[in-house]
């Protein structure tokens, strides 16, 4: 605990919070162009082929973002919408691609958590 004299001499430092997604420049999402679409393997205890894309954003940053859901239609030069959110077992992946927005198709045959994967509500089955 500083004394009054110490506070007069040198004021308290302001705590600056660091953004977890600096490439978005304080926006909720940003548009970008895929420069490379590929698969990569996760960190040690996990094993899979995770689908990721390198995206050049409108802010000028080039980021690696994760493509969630089963199957995708992305390729080089696809226009995508990128949101924040890291993938714990993929180092360097701090962004997600929004499914069902711009060139990214929603996940087919998805019935639960549809809004997260850009899937429309299925037509009611006729009896």
Swiss-Prot record:
Family matches, as CDD domains: Ribosomal_S12
Gene3D superfamilies the record matches: Nucleic acid-binding proteins
PROSITE patterns: RIBOSOMAL_S12
Coiled coil region boundaries: none
UniProt protein name: Small ribosomal subunit protein uS12
One Gene Ontology biological process: translation
Residues recorded as bearing 3-methylthioaspartic acid in the entry: 89
Role: With S4 and S5 plays an important role in translational accuracy.
UniProt record similarity statement: Belongs to the universal ribosomal protein uS12 family.
UniProt signal peptide: none
GO CC annotations on file: small ribosomal subunit
PANTHER family, per the entry: 30S RIBOSOMAL PROTEIN S12 FAMILY MEMBER
Keywords: Methylation, Ribonucleoprotein, Ribosomal protein, RNA-binding, rRNA-binding, tRNA-binding
GO molecular function: rRNA binding; structural constituent of ribosome; tRNA binding
UniProt subunit comment: Part of the 30S ribosomal subunit. Contacts proteins S8 and S17. May interact with IF1 in the 30S initiation complex.
């Amino acid at each position: 605990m500083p004394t009054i004299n110490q506070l007069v001499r040198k004021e308290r430092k302001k705590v600056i919070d660091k953004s977890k997604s600096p490439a978005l420049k304080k926006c909720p999402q940003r548009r970008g162009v895929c420069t490379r679409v590929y698969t990569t393997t996760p960190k040690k205890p996990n094993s899979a082929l995770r689908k990721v894309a390198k995206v050049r954003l409108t802010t000028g940053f080039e980021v690696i973002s994760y493509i969630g859901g089963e199957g995708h239609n992305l390729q080089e030069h696809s226009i995508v919408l990128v949101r924040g959110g890291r993938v714990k077992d993929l180092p360097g992946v701090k962004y997600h691609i929004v499914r069902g927005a711009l060139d990214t198709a929603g996940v087919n045959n998805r019935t639960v958590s549809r809004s997260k994967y850009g899937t429309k509500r299925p037509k009611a089955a006729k009896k």
